């Protein structure tokens, strides 16, 4: 009868003699295709090249709108892109209709050296496919007559310009996102949202409904002209802190900019923060548990962000800068140790933790399992699922041991332990109380509930056996 050989720690750590010349701390250089890690410093990030914006008149905004929506407009120059962004940054205050971004910006001495003098060029061009006028659009929101939305002929120049700025600001989300196939539904929603914020509507939202191809061209233009994109990002980042005390303006900006441009490619960090908000555990405990093999650098990066940058964690964070949240739109080297493609197992584990906690769903468009880094990798998702199960077990156990834990939490944690060991041989009783809970939970094996006896569902795959944590109460 064969026996499993005993493997000691020394066996596992043994290194071949010729290989001992290699450094234990150095690592091979990353492939050139991977962006180089860049340490975030506000003083450096705020100096990325940008243009100085100017206030546009209503006539200039409407004229430019007519230009880029024309059949003849087949290419986007840097000058065109800059005008597009200036239209977006001409967004109006929903209360007094003043220009939001005229109210404040960082002092010029913090910005790039040529901030006041740099001008966009007309040389480079990006192809733009004209929106498809033949698409039949299903209207989810009814059109309004002169009591709401005016026709192109009767609507005032100011009303058109206000709607165009809102529309262009909304379209900036496609600088970092791919347009979905359901884009026409989103066009109806943006018109409805404009009505909620500004208590009026506009014919502009029916005049121009660009195709996915046009939106891809817009994304390409943002990527081709980084100085234009940088200008947008710096203004948005400044506005998040500046307008927090002004809810009506902040909510408009959150819908148009913040929720789309922040934390680009940092699904892991967003997931960690979301999980922390749902569990009664200190952030340090959660990070310690999540620092599993292969995720050390990613979790250490998350710790660095929380310890030095995250506005909810640092002293006086409410008034501190928030450019760090948008820094990856300037340079993808920022925080790239947390980038989804570099930490797939961590992403999978976090996804299943969210699913187990009811934060996210396992199926559907918004499921975290659709994240590109793990979507088609069954092996990584299986490892993530098992580690997520362990995280949930640890969370339940710790919660059940706290002094003011609910009796429900205690019984639930004990029941989860029994479920994990259900495929193993019965363990000898350690305490008399265990027999009492077994009797209370099962009421003897022969007295199954009718629904259990009649079920035709196939048995689920057993969860991996887990060593019982010390001091977990048995009932």
UniProtKB/Swiss-Prot annotation:
Compositional bias of kind Basic and acidic residues: 421-436, 451-460
Listed name of the protein: Nucleoprotein
UniProt-recorded Gene Ontology molecular function terms: RNA binding
Gene expressing this chain: N
GO CC list: helical viral capsid; ribonucleoprotein complex; viral nucleocapsid
Segments of this protein annotated with the region Disordered: 421-461
Subcellular location: Virion
Main localization of the protein described in the UniProt heading: virion
Organismal lineage: Viruses, Riboviria, Orthornavirae, Negarnaviricota, Haploviricotina
Organism: Sonchus yellow net virus (SYNV)
């Amino acid at each position: 009868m064969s026996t499993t050989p005993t493997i000691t720690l020394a066996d596992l750590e043994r290194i071949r003699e010729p290989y001992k010349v290699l450094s234990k701390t150095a690592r091979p250089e990353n492939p050139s295709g991977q962006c180089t890690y860049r340490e975030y410093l506000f003083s450096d990030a705020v100096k990325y090249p940008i243009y100085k914006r100017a206030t546009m008149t209503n006539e200039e905004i409407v004229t430019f709108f007519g230009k880029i929506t024309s059949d003849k407009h087949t290419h986007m120059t840097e000058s065109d892109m800059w005008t597009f962004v200036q239209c977006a940054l001409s967004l109006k205050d929903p209360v007094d209709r003043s220009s939001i971004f005229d109210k404040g910006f960082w002092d010029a001495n913090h910005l790039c050296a040529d901030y006041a003098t740099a001008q966009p060029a007309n040389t480079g061009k990006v192809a733009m496919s004209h929106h498809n006028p033949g698409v039949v659009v299903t209207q989810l929101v009814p059109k309004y007559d002169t009591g709401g939305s005016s026709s192109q002929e009767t609507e005032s120049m100011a009303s058109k310009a206000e709607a165009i700025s809102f529309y262009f600001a909304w379209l900036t989300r496609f600088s970092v996102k791919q347009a979905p196939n359901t884009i026409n539904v989103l066009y109806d929603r943006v018109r409805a949202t404009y009505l909620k914020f500004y208590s009026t509507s506009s014919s502009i939202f029916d005049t121009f409904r660009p195709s996915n191809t046009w939106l891809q061209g817009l994304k390409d233009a943002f990527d081709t002209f980084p100085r234009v994109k940088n200008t947008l990002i710096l203004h948005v980042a400044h506005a998040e802190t500046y307008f927090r005390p002004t809810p009506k303006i902040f909510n408009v900006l959150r819908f148009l900019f913040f929720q789309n441009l922040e934390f680009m490619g940092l699904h892991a960090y967003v997931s960690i923060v979301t999980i922390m908000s749902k569990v009664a555990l200190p952030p340090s405990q959660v990070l310690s548990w999540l620092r599993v093999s292969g995720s050390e650098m990613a979790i250490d990066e998350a710790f660095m962000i929380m310890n030095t940058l995250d506005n909810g964690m640092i002293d006086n964070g409410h008034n501190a800068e928030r450019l760090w949240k948008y820094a990856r739109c300037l340079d993808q080297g920022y925080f790239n140790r947390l980038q989804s493609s570099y930490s797939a197992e961590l992403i999978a584990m976090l996804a299943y933790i969210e699913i187990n906690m009811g934060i996210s769903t396992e199926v559907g468009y918004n499921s975290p399992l659709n994240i590109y880094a793990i979507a088609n990798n069954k092996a990584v998702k299986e490892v993530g699922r098992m580690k997520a199960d362990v995280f949930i077990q640890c969370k339940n156990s710790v919660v059940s041991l706290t002094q003011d834990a609910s009796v429900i939490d205690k019984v639930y944690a004990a029941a989860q332990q029994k479920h994990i060991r259900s495929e193993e041989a019965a363990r000898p009783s350690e305490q008399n109380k265990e027999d009492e809970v077994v009797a209370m939970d099962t009421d003897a094996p022969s007295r199954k509930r009718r629904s259990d006896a009649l079920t035709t569902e196939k048995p689920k795959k057993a969860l991996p056996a887990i060593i019982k944590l010390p001091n977990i109460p048995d009932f």
